[in-house]
């Protein structure tokens, strides 16, 4: 399996740690960076390349939807797989995220299997994983 790189964006450190542990267990050798909000993620995405972004919706400074919208406006990030990992699972929020160009949606709380399935699907679709 080729090495993949993921940016995990969430203001809750325990969620970032949970996501990173889950991904490291399933994808040995994965490169993971993290950010505490959309603004920090924006700075990281401006200087580094990733295969996938996993992002919370509700965060201080810049929310996940704002980060997603910004990514879709950048030529080099327009097709970057972007999965929302959020407690905002109601229909209006899901539709809003889809309209903004989200690649996938994982509702909190989630199981490791749910997260890994969404990540694998997004990476396969983008041609970043060997099937």
Task: Please give the residue ranges for each predicted region.
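C-terminal output helix
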Residues: 110-119
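Receiver (REC) domain active-site loop signature in two-component systems and cognate sites
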Residues: 59
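Helix N-cap/capping motif at the beta->alpha junctions
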Residues: 34-43, 64
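Short amphipathic alpha-helix used as the core "switch/output" element in two-component signaling
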Residues: 43, 65-78
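Two-component/phosphorelay signaling modules centered on CheY-like receiver
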Residues: 13-33
């Amino acid at each position: 399996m080729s090495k993949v790189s993921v940016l995990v964006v969430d203001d809750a450190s325990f969620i970032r740690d949970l996501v990173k542990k889950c991904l490291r267990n399933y994808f040995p050798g994965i490169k993971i960076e993290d950010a505490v909000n959309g603004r920090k993620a924006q700075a990281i995405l401006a200087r580094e390349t990733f295969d996938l972004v996993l992002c919370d919706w509700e965060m201080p400074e810049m929310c996940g939807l704002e980060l997603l919208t910004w990514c879709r406006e950048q030529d080099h990030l327009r097709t970057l797989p972007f999965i929302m990992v959020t407690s905002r699972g109601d229909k209006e929020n899901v539709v809003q995220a889809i309209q903004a160009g989200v690649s996938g949606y994982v509702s909190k709380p989630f199981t490791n299997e749910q997260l890994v399935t969404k990540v694998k699907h997004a990476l396969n679709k983008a041609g970043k994983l060997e099937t």
